[in-house]
């Protein structure tokens, strides 16, 4: 449903590819920090997850 609203996958990939060349250093740093934050949160969730006891 989201893809239909935003366009096809090819269009999104093409836009992302074109935008990568135009990233300012500040925006690039922000994206990198965001990705690292998400990875860190996923790792913590995986490491701290436990089976519920019945």
From Swiss-Prot:
Family: Belongs to the DVL/RTFL small polypeptides family.
Organism of provenance: Arabidopsis thaliana (Mouse-ear cress)
Annotated glycan sites: 26
Keyword tags: Cell membrane, Developmental protein, Glycoprotein, Membrane, Transmembrane, Transmembrane helix
Segments for region (Required for DVL/RTFL small polypeptide activity): 20-51
One GO process term, biological-process aspect: shoot system development
Gene Ontology cellular component terms for the protein in this record: plasma membrane
Function: Small polypeptide acting as a regulatory molecule which coordinates cellular responses required for differentiation, growth and development, probably by restricting polar cell proliferation in lateral organs and coordinating socket cell recruitment and differentiation at trichome sites.
Protein's UniProt name: Small polypeptide DEVIL 12
Membrane topology: Single-pass membrane protein
């Amino acid at each position: 449903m989201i893809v239909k609203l935003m366009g096809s996958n090819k269009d999104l990939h093409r836009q992302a590819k074109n935008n990568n060349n135009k990233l300012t250093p500040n925006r690039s740093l922000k994206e990198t920090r965001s990705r690292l934050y998400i990875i860190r949160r996923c790792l913590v969730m995986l490491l701290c997850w436990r089976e519920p006891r019945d």
